[in-house]
Swiss-Prot record:
GO terms assigned for molecular function: rRNA binding; structural constituent of ribosome
Reported function: One of two assembly initiator proteins, it binds directly to the 5'-end of the 23S rRNA, where it nucleates assembly of the 50S subunit. One of the proteins that surrounds the polypeptide exit tunnel on the outside of the subunit.
Sorted UniProt keywords: Ribonucleoprotein, Ribosomal protein, RNA-binding, rRNA-binding
CDD domains per UniProt: KOW_RPL26 (cd06089)
Family designation: Belongs to the universal ribosomal protein uL24 family.
Gene that encodes it: rplX
Domain of life: Bacteria
Species of the source: Lachnospira eligens (strain ATCC 27750 / DSM 3376 / VPI C15-48 / C15-B4) (Eubacterium eligens)
Any one of the GO CC terms: ribosome
Quaternary assembly: Part of the 50S ribosomal subunit.
PANTHER family (UniProt xref): MITOCHONDRIAL RIBOSOMAL PROTEIN L24
Protein name, as recorded: Large ribosomal subunit protein uL24
Gene3D superfamilies (UniProt xref): 2.30.30.30
Length: 103
């Protein structure tokens, strides 16, 4: 498997699957399973019983993890690959399409 170059807080675009074309913010990344949780993407329905934490219970809609290979970093509405470069002795992420430093 390749390295995970997507980080929490990045804006990504879905490039494959049922939500293809949607954009969202990365809520969390699981490098071990090669998945990411993206806001508003890959929504699933959960049926919750009433409990101390959830008095009413009922049907909940929440995000499910999506494979990293199905998302791409979105820079100004266009998807791009991410590479690494060294600037002033520090390793930084760079958009391969434009050469722009991401962080």
């Amino acid at each position: 498997m390749s390295a995970v170059r997507i980080k929490k807080g990045d804006t990504v675009k879905v490039i494959a699957g049922k939500d293809k074309g949607k954009e969202g913010k990365v809520l969390s990344v699981n490098a071990k399973n090669h998945t990411a949780l993206v806001e508003g993407v890959n929504m699933v329905t959960k049926h919750a019983k009433p409990s101390a934490a959830n008095q009413q219970g009922g049907i909940l809609h929440q995000e499910a993890p999506i494979d990293i290979s199905n998302i791409a970093y979105s820079l100004k509405g266009k998807e791009t690959k991410i590479g690494y470069d060294f600037k002033d002795g520090k390793k930084v992420r760079v958009a391969k399409a434009t050469g722009e430093v991401i962080d």
